[in-house]
Swiss-Prot record:
It is an enzyme of class 3 (hydrolase). Pfam families: Maf (PF02545). Its EC number is 3.6.1.9. The record marks 11, 72, 156 as: Important for substrate specificity. One of its GO terms (biological process) is nucleotide metabolic process. This is dTTP/UTP pyrophosphatase.
Length: 192
C-alpha cells in the first residue's frame, strides 16, 4: 500500500520521514478559503485537512493508497491566524501574539482508498509568547521565516526564541503531530 502526503510543506515531509521511509508527496490544490471558520477550532482544521486529502485522492489513479492531509492554524482570542499574506500582516500577528497565550491546532485526515474509509482527528497545543518589542519583530521579519507559517512564526527556527512556554505536542506547532499521526495510522492497520 502506498502512503501519500497531501502537502507542499517541507516541514511535514521531514517529519513524516521520521515515521515512514517511502512515501509520495502530492500537492493539494484544495481552496482553503472555501472553509469558513465557524467558531470551532478543531472542526475548522479537520475540514481543511479533509479537503486536502480528498483533493489528492481524486488525483490518484492508484487505488491502493492511504492519503494523509494535515492543516495547522493558530488561534488567538477566538480568531484564526493563518499564514500571513504579507509582511505587514505578519507584523500585526506577532504583535498580537506578544506576551499572550495562543492555541495551535492541527487537523489530520487519513483516507484509505481501498476501504473508502476516512479517519479524522486534531491536536491542540498551547503556546505562551514572551513580550516582543517592535524592533525585535521587525528584525525577525527581515529573516523571511514568517512566510508560509500559521501565526507568522516557526517554533523550529528563530521564531522559537519568542516561545516562553509550551503545553502539548511540540511537533503539532511545527505542523505535523507525530504521536497522533502514528496512533491514527496504526489504528488503520498501517505497519510503521
Amino acid at each position: 500500500m502506498k502512503i501519500v502526503l497531501a502537502s507542499a510543506s517541507s516541514r511535514r515531509r521531514q517529519l513524516l520521514s521520521r515515521l515512514i521511509e517511502n512515501f509520495q508527496v502530492v500537492v493539494s490544490d484544495f481552496d482553503e478559503d472555501s472553509v469558513v471558520f465557524q467558531g470551532r477550532c478543531e472542526s475548522y482544521v479537520m475540514k481543511l485537512a479533509e479537503g486536502k486529502a480528498k483533493d489528492v485522492c481524486r488525483k490518484l489513479t492508484n487505488e491502493s493508497s492511504i492519503v494523509i492531509g494535515c492543516d495547522t492554524a493558530v488561534f488567538l482570542r477566538g480568531k484564526v491566524m493563518g499564514k500571513p499574506r504579507d509582511i505587514q500582516e505578519a507584523f500585526h500577528m506577532l504583535k498580537a501574539l506578544s506576551g499572550n497565550e495562543h492555541d495551535v491546532y492541527s487537523g489530520i485526515a487519513i483516507m484509505d482508498k481501498v476501504l473508502h474509509k476516512t479517519v479524522k482527528s486534531f491536536v491542540r497545543t498551547t503556546v505562551k509568547f514572551s513580550e516582543i518589542d517592535d524592533r525585535c519583530i521587525k528584525n525577525y521579519l527581515k529573516k523571511g521565516e514568517y512566510k508560509d507559517k500559521a501565526g507568522a512564526y516557526g517554533i523550529q527556527g528563530y521564531g522559537g526564541v519568542f516561545v516562553k512556554e509550551i503545553h502539548g505536542c511540540y511537533y503539532n506547532v511545527v505542523g505535523l503531530p507525530l504521536n497522533k499521526l502514528y496512533n491514527m495510522l496504526s489504528g488503520m492497520g498501517v505497519n510503521l
